[in-house]
From Swiss-Prot:
PANTHER family the UniProt entry points to: MITOCHONDRIAL RIBOSOMAL PROTEIN L24
One BP annotation, GO: translation
Protein's UniProt name: Large ribosomal subunit protein uL24
Family: Belongs to the universal ribosomal protein uL24 family.
Residue ranges of coiled coil: none
SUPFAM superfamilies: Translation proteins SH3-like domain
GO cellular component terms attached to this protein's record: ribonucleoprotein complex; ribosome
Subunit and interaction comment: Part of the 50S ribosomal subunit.
Single GO molecular function: rRNA binding
Length: 105
């Protein structure tokens, strides 16, 4: 189960960008892929197409990473953390498992 939401601050825990941080922009493939700002940037060669107004050249593009390769970043501990759910005032909220602080303030 994916416990990330759009706008969460995450850290990459596996892969070529391991240790880098970013913000979740969107999800793909039912939530199994996560598009993170500034992570997994690739260079794509684009052919010019005057009909569409596209110039040719090398374009940098962000590709999604697997959700299992990112973890939510806990600013209090400055490390990756796990997320749990609990009820506060009859409202379901997320909290960091390491120190019990709420994720959604």
């Amino acid at each position: 189960m994916n416990r990330l939401k759009k706008g969460d601050d995450v850290i990459v825990i596996a892969g070529k960008d391991k240790g880098r941080r970013g913000v979740v922009k969107s999800f793909a493939k039912g939530g199994s892929l996560v598009l993170v700002e500034g992570i997994n940037i690739v260079k794509k060669h684009v052919k010019p197409n005057p009909n569409r107004g596209v110039e040719g050249g090398v374009v940098e593009k962000e590709l999604p990473v697997d959700a299992s390769n990112v973890a939510i970043f806990n600013p209090a501990t400055e490390k990756a953390d796990r997320v749990g759910y609990k009820f506060v005032d009859e409202k379901k909220v997320r909290y960091f498992k390491s120190n019990g602080e709420l994720v959604d303030l």
